[in-house]
Swiss-Prot record:
This is Adenine phosphoribosyltransferase. Catalyzes a salvage reaction resulting in the formation of AMP, that is energically less costly than de novo synthesis. The keyword Nucleotide-binding does not apply. It comes from the Bacteria. GO terms for molecular function: adenine binding; adenine phosphoribosyltransferase activity; AMP binding. Pfam families: Pribosyltran. Its main location: cytoplasm. It is an enzyme of class 2 (transferase).
Length: 184
């Protein structure tokens, strides 16, 4: 776990992110307010501020690999890894990776889903930061954490753009150190 003192100042990134997230009502189903990050992605300066904040976090944690969770986590993990000079590991939906994989099921609102990672994705002891767009219920993050630990990784944390606090996802991430740029 990291101390509060070692965390980068995320206030600038939070302000930029807040100005570049659009609420989409009733998507993907009635009653849901979807947080759309495409305005952030389409504004290079704003995207750069947010990626820079995530890269600063990764550096501070000593991450040598960045793991991105399908699909929007890929959009963040790749530029963060590039800025840090780290490798990138994709954590994908079931059936999307060739070769030998590890699998982890997690609960959805109705049913289950499965995430996969290559068996040889990270060497034992590799310092990995998981990156995703949103922490909601915590199921996806917990599954990603389990997969990486199963490969022998030293998972240094989870970094997300937004944390939907009303869903209590942080409670399901166990010992995983979570950093969110913005809490909703």
């Amino acid at each position: 776990m990291t101390s509060v003192d070692s965390q980068p100042d995320l206030s600038a990134a939070e302000a930029v992110l807040g100005a570049h997230v659009r609420d989409v009502m009733d998507f993907p189903k009635p009653g849901v307010v979807f947080k759309d990050i495409t305005p952030l992605l389409s504004t290079p300066a704003a995207f750069g501020v947010v990626v820079g904040a995530l890269a600063d976090l990764a550096r501070g944690l000593g991450a040598t690999t960045i793991a991105g969770i399908e699909a929007r986590g890929f959009l963040l993990a790749a530029p963060v890894a590039d800025r840090v000079g780290a490798g990138i590991v994709p954590i994908r939906k079931q059936g999307k990776l060739p070769g030998r994989t590890r699998s982890e099921a997690y609960a959805l609102e109705y049913g289950t889903a499965v995430l996969e990672i290559h068996e040889d994705a990270v060497p034992t002891g590799e310092r990995v930061l998981i990156v995703d767009d949103v922490l909601a219920t915590g199921g996806t993050a917990a599954a990603a954490h389990t997969l990486l630990r199963g490969c022998g990784a030293d998972v240094v944390g989870l970094a997300v753009l937004m944390e939907l606090t009303f869903l209590s996802g942080r409670d399901r991430t166990g010992t995983l150190d979570v950093t969110s740029i913005m809490k909703i």
